[in-house]
């Protein structure tokens, strides 16, 4: 049940989100793990969530026909957005926009098989007034 030292899923997601396109992450992805990265910018939080969900589905990080996987990913994305927006996910209503790089990682960070697979979402970028 202990977290494996080389299998820190949140850290892996952050490294992937921080890496440029031409960089590879410092750590290699553990065998059997899935991930995707991308960029999203919008004044609409629904578009941010939709772009990240679409990336995860098109890169086979989650299965498109399994509701539980989509639901788990949605909650992980919302938690990450809460962090970036400091608890207020409103963007357009308060004239804020985001430009973000994201990483979504799915894997088994724990030794025990009973713990199952986990998903981590990391966001990195800017939040501020829209540029006109």
UniProtKB/Swiss-Prot annotation:
Keyword annotations: Activator, Histidine metabolism, RNA-binding, Transcription, Transcription regulation
Q: Which InterPro entries match?
A: Regulatory_HutP, Regulatory_HutP_sf
| Gene Ontology MF terms | RNA binding
Per the record, the coiled-coil ranges are none
- GO BP of this protein: L-histidine metabolic process
Q: How does it assemble?
A: Homohexamer.
Per the entry, what this protein does is: Antiterminator that binds to cis-acting regulatory sequences on the mRNA in the presence of histidine, thereby suppressing transcription termination and activating the hut operon for histidine utilization.
Instruction: Say which family it is in.
Output: Belongs to the HutP family.
Q: What is this protein called?
A: Hut operon positive regulatory protein
Species source reads Bacillus cereus
Which gene name does the record give?
Answer: hutP
């Amino acid at each position: 049940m202990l977290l494996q030292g080389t299998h820190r899923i949140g850290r892996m997601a952050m490294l992937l989100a921080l890496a440029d396109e031409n960089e590879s992450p410092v750590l290699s992805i553990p065998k059997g793990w899935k991930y995707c990265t991308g960029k999203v910018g919008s004044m609409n939080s629904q578009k941010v969530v939709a772009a990240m969900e679409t990336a995860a589905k098109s890169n086979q990080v989650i299965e498109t026909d399994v509701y539980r996987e989509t639901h788990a990913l949605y909650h992980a994305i919302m938690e990450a957005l809460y962090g970036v927006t400091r608890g207020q996910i409103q963007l357009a209503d308060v004239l804020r926009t985001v430009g973000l790089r994201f990483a979504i990682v799915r894997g088994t960070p724990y030794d025990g098989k009973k713990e199952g697979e986990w998903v981590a979402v990391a966001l990195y970028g800017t939040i501020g007034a829209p540029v006109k």
